[in-house]
Amino acid sequence: MSALLTAAGLLFLGMLQAFPTDRPLKTTCAGDLSHYPGEAARNCCYQCPSGLSPTQPCPRGPAHCRKQCAPDYYVNEDGKCTACVTCLPGLVEKAPCSGNSPRICECQPGMHCCTPAVNSCARCKLHCSGEEVVKSPGTAKKDTICELPSSGSGPNCSNPGDRKTLTSHATPQAMPTLESPANDSARSLLPMRVTNLVQEDATELVKVPESSSSKAREPSPDPGNAEKNMTLELPSPGTLPDISTSENSKEPASTASTLSLVVDAWTSSRMQPTSPLSTGTPFLDPGPVLFWVAMVVLLVGSGSFLLCYWKACRRRFQQKFHLDYLVQTFQPKMEQTDSCPTEKLTQPQRSGSVTDPSTGHKLSPVSPPPAVETCASVGATYLENLPLLDDSPAGNPFSPREPPEPRVSTEHTNNRIEKIYIMKADTVIVGSVKTEVPEGRAPAGSTESELEAELEVDHAPHYPEQETEPPLGSCTEVMFSVEEGGKEDHGPTTVSEK
């Protein structure tokens, strides 16, 4: 019976395996475009959008999709593509650059990073120098604690490299103190020996066996003492070697030679100036600073001088041009006689005589006045530059007159006073007439009193022969009296010429 039950169970399991298991999955993922059927897990997987790549074979959702970046780029925490760093020479790659993790670079073994950078190091440094020993080991980011070696594990002086290291590092810190009961003669040998050692090879130190006459004390083994004092004792005067002999001068292991080498090294270290770079203080060369300061002062001074000189010259030129302009503007213009065209005004020929009222006799006929030249440009008779014909002396009627003084033209308009002669039978009335002078012409000798003068009357009898000639330079009206022929007792006739 039990065997029958077992066979039935196996048959049932075989029937279950015969049914297809992917049929319901296909129907479930077929209508959803964001999922697709997975082959490995036999279920629906999430379809990542374009530009994103799945982080696992069958992503379950958007969390399993990441941005697809170019090679040597990774997706940072913000979901952006970021370039991976490149390991510089002297660095090693600790982690490679992948799609979701950056590349990490670190210093080589035996060095630590003293200037860190993002996923890298900008400057690496050795943990300990050659003369130091490791006290506490460090890592790529933490420095190793180093210390100086102890006196027991000091360098071997028999090695030439160690001797050079000892000479270059230990000698400047040693402060030798000479203690000796020797007299002045023994001390005077020291500079002589130092002078002789300049010619020898002073780079090698020779071990001197300890003796009762020469003892060299070792430096203090205390590492906390930064400055070590070396105390040297000179031998007694009796035990000093004779340096005058050739045998003693050739001994390389003599006490005086060793002492002189130490003193020579100490003297050279004391006389050598300390470099400012070794002490860590900033060094400023005053040469370029002084040069640039001098250049700035020179440029400022020359610029100020040129600016002041330019302003002074400009002011001087402006004053000069202003004066020249004033002189050209107000310069008096000389009027010449022949500068304007002349017009000859002909007077009508009139023949007549004047009868003297007191005697009743006829006087000589009056000759007409000469022709008058007028200035067409001005508009008034310009007679001030024309000589009078009847004014020449009797001896020489053709002798020229002196040229009249030129008139200065102004821009004002003044009233010109001229005398008018009115002839009657027994009286002559003398008065004044106001005339306008054109612009640019100023009458000579005119005053305000003459402009405001009233009419004056003179009752003295005058005749045509006694008339005064018109003044020089008068371009205004000229009036005189004539008597026409055939008429008696006729009033005065006025002839005006303009």
UniProtKB/Swiss-Prot annotation:
<feature type="compositionally biased region" description="Polar residues">
    <location>
        <begin position="338"/>
        <end position="358"/>
    </location>
</feature>
<feature type="region of interest" description="Disordered">
    <location>
        <begin position="389"/>
        <end position="411"/>
    </location>
</feature>
<feature type="disulfide bond">
    <location>
        <begin position="69"/>
        <end position="81"/>
    </location>
</feature>
<feature type="compositionally biased region" description="Low complexity">
    <location>
        <begin position="149"/>
        <end position="160"/>
    </location>
</feature>
<feature type="glycosylation site" description="N-linked (GlcNAc...) asparagine">
    <location>
        <position position="229"/>
    </location>
</feature>
<dbReference type="GO" id="GO:0007165">
    <property type="term" value="P:signal transduction"/>
</dbReference>
<feature type="topological domain" description="Extracellular">
    <location>
        <begin position="19"/>
        <end position="287"/>
    </location>
</feature>
<feature type="modified residue" description="Phosphoserine">
    <location>
        <position position="353"/>
    </location>
</feature>
<feature type="compositionally biased region" description="Polar residues">
    <location>
        <begin position="242"/>
        <end position="256"/>
    </location>
</feature>
<keyword id="KW-0597">Phosphoprotein</keyword>
<feature type="transmembrane region" description="Helical">
    <location>
        <begin position="288"/>
        <end position="308"/>
    </location>
</feature>
<dbReference type="InterPro" id="IPR020416">
    <property type="entry name" value="TNFR_8"/>
</dbReference>
<feature type="compositionally biased region" description="Basic and acidic residues">
    <location>
        <begin position="484"/>
        <end position="498"/>
    </location>
</feature>
<keyword id="KW-0812">Transmembrane</keyword>
<feature type="region of interest" description="Disordered">
    <location>
        <begin position="204"/>
        <end position="256"/>
    </location>
</feature>
<feature type="glycosylation site" description="N-linked (GlcNAc...) asparagine">
    <location>
        <position position="183"/>
    </location>
</feature>
<feature type="disulfide bond">
    <location>
        <begin position="107"/>
        <end position="121"/>
    </location>
</feature>
<keyword id="KW-0472">Membrane</keyword>
<dbReference type="InterPro" id="IPR034002">
    <property type="entry name" value="TNFRSF8_N"/>
</dbReference>
<keyword id="KW-0675">Receptor</keyword>
<protein>
    <recommendedName>
        <fullName>Tumor necrosis factor receptor superfamily member 8</fullName>
    </recommendedName>
</protein>
<feature type="glycosylation site" description="N-linked (GlcNAc...) asparagine">
    <location>
        <position position="156"/>
    </location>
</feature>
<keyword id="KW-0732">Signal</keyword>
<dbReference type="GO" id="GO:0005886">
    <property type="term" value="C:plasma membrane"/>
</dbReference>
<dbReference type="GO" id="GO:0004888">
    <property type="term" value="F:transmembrane signaling receptor activity"/>
</dbReference>
<feature type="region of interest" description="Disordered">
    <location>
        <begin position="338"/>
        <end position="370"/>
    </location>
</feature>
<feature type="modified residue" description="Phosphoserine">
    <location>
        <position position="339"/>
    </location>
</feature>
<comment type="similarity">
    <text>Belongs to the TNFR8 family.</text>
</comment>
<feature type="region of interest" description="Disordered">
    <location>
        <begin position="436"/>
        <end position="498"/>
    </location>
</feature>
<feature type="repeat" description="TNFR-Cys 2">
    <location>
        <begin position="106"/>
        <end position="146"/>
    </location>
</feature>
<keyword id="KW-0677">Repeat</keyword>
<feature type="repeat" description="TNFR-Cys 1">
    <location>
        <begin position="68"/>
        <end position="105"/>
    </location>
</feature>
<feature type="topological domain" description="Cytoplasmic">
    <location>
        <begin position="309"/>
        <end position="498"/>
    </location>
</feature>
<feature type="signal peptide">
    <location>
        <begin position="1"/>
        <end position="18"/>
    </location>
</feature>
<feature type="disulfide bond">
    <location>
        <begin position="84"/>
        <end position="97"/>
    </location>
</feature>
<feature type="compositionally biased region" description="Basic and acidic residues">
    <location>
        <begin position="402"/>
        <end position="411"/>
    </location>
</feature>
<keyword id="KW-1015">Disulfide bond</keyword>
<feature type="compositionally biased region" description="Basic and acidic residues">
    <location>
        <begin position="456"/>
        <end position="465"/>
    </location>
</feature>
<dbReference type="InterPro" id="IPR001368">
    <property type="entry name" value="TNFR/NGFR_Cys_rich_reg"/>
</dbReference>
<keyword id="KW-1133">Transmembrane helix</keyword>
<keyword id="KW-0325">Glycoprotein</keyword>
<comment type="function">
    <text>Receptor for TNFSF8/CD30L. May play a role in the regulation of cellular growth and transformation of activated lymphoblasts. Regulates gene expression through activation of NF-kappa-B.</text>
</comment>
